[in-house]
Amino acid sequence: MRDVYEVLKEKGITLPQPPAKGGVYTPVQELGEKFLYCSGCGPDLGNGNTVVGKLGKDLTVEDGQKAAYNCVLNLLANLNEKTGDLNRIKRFVKVLAFVNSADDFGMQPQVVNGGSNLIAGPVSYTHLTLPTI
């Protein structure tokens, strides 16, 4: 597997600072020696780069994909802070995504792909996840 940081740099992707915690929880918890459990991350990158609204009403699929992408960037920032090296991450087992959408909106998987593609594409984790949407 290629160096994650080299791939991010080639793609022009900069990890944000880990997001501020919104409550009493641990962003990344170690379970044994080889498993990390991550709390959810929202789309706010802490620099005004965020997405707010309801898909199918206020937001387009592309807006939702940007939100999902931002969520994964925040997740990677938390993992980087916890592990000290994203190259130690070998696989993502599951992605749980909550998509704020109108009742008649049916493109939640395409929205979530905005984040999943960051894991499977530029970051190049070879084993894809089991998504729950």
Regions from the language model: what does each represent?
Residues M1-P19:
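Basic, amphipathic N-terminal segments that precede the first structured/catalytic domain
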Residues P27-D63:
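RNase H-like nuclease fold core
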Residues L36-G40, V93-A102:
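Short, well-ordered beta-strand segments in beta-rich or mixed alpha/beta enzyme
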Residues A67-K82, G115-L118:
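Short, well-ordered amphipathic alpha-helical segments that serve as non-catalytic structural scaffolds
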Residues K82-I89:
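Phosphate/pyrophosphate-binding loops at sites that engage ATP/ADP/AMP, CoA/4′-phosphopantetheine
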Residues A102-Y125:
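Short, hydrophobic/π-rich interface segment
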Residues T126-T132:
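Conserved small/polar residues in nucleotide/adenosyl-binding loops
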